UniProtKB/Swiss-Prot annotation:
A Pfam family hit: LolB
Assembly behavior: Monomer.
Signal peptide: 1-21
Gene for this chain: lolB
Lipidation (N-palmitoyl cysteine): 22
Main location: membrane
Native source organism of the sequence: Haemophilus influenzae (strain ATCC 51907 / DSM 11121 / KW20 / Rd)
Protein name: Outer-membrane lipoprotein LolB
Lipidation feature positions (S-diacylglycerol cysteine): 22
Record's keyword annotation contains NADP: no
Keyword set, alphabetical order: Cell outer membrane, Chaperone, Lipoprotein, Membrane, Palmitate, Protein transport, Signal, Transport
Topological relation to the membrane, as annotated: Lipid-anchor
Length: 209
């Protein structure tokens, strides 16, 4: 891409265009009851989602940080840690961003033909979009699979209720608010990082795996 300023200007317009009037509930739920992690139904479900290696998810995402605030439709396609795509788009403005992970790093592009690539995906996300979200971990968080070293809780629905996970010196928390009744996959997820003051609220409307 020849003009970084043009790309940044576009992403600013994109964020403005997809802002919605609804507000994100930034507070974690309270008085939630949990059950033991050895619960047989949960262990069976955990084995099921661990076998899901590649999948697609579609829905809506809302993001709040001290410098950015936007809401967007999204399409997530995941194959492996070195091959995934996150598409952010607006049904109103037709603005679209593609975030693509590949063997040599990450590429972010838009529907105007702007494109930027870098080997360091974390820095590229921060520079272009202003997000500091570990997408490599989001692949597991999205489907409700806690990391092996994560401190997590199981809800009374026998599914993942919440977890705490440390990434790059800061702590992320996740609360799984609702699940789809037909496949027991997450529907509404609240992700927060209090140290970086980031909130990510995700609603998954469709799962394909």
């Amino acid at each position: 891409m020849n003009n970084m300023k043009t790309f940044k200007f576009f992403t600013a317009l994109f964020a403005t265009a997809i802002l919605t009037a609804c507000t994100l509930d930034m507070e974690r739920p309270t008085n939630v009851q949990y059950i033991d992690k050895t619960d047989a139904i949960w262990q069976q479900h955990l084995q099921k989602i661990q076998k899901i290696q590649s999948y697609q998810a579609k829905g809506q995402i809302g993001y709040i940080s001290p410098t950015e605030r936007f809401s967007s439709r999204f399409e997530w396609q995941y194959q492996n840690p070195k091959s995934y795509t996150l598409k952010l788009y607006s049904l109103i403005s037709k603005s679209t961003l593609w975030i693509q992970m590949h063997q040599s790093g990450m590429t972010i592009s838009d529907n105007n033909g702007n494109q930027q690539s870098a080997a360091n995906s974390k820095l590229l996300l921060q520079e272009i979009i202003g997000m500091d979200v570990p997408l490599e971990h989001l692949a597991y968080w999205l489907k409700g699979q806690p990391a092996m070293n994560a401190d997590y809780q199981v809800g009374t629905n026998h599914l993942l209720g919440a977890f705490t996970y440390h990434v790059d010196g800061s702590q992320w928390t996740a609360d799984y608010l609702t699940y789809h009744s037909n496949n027991s996959m997450p529907e509404n997820i609240l992700l927060k990082n209090d140290s970086t003051k980031q909130t990510l609220k995700i609603r998954v409307d469709e799962w394909i795996y």
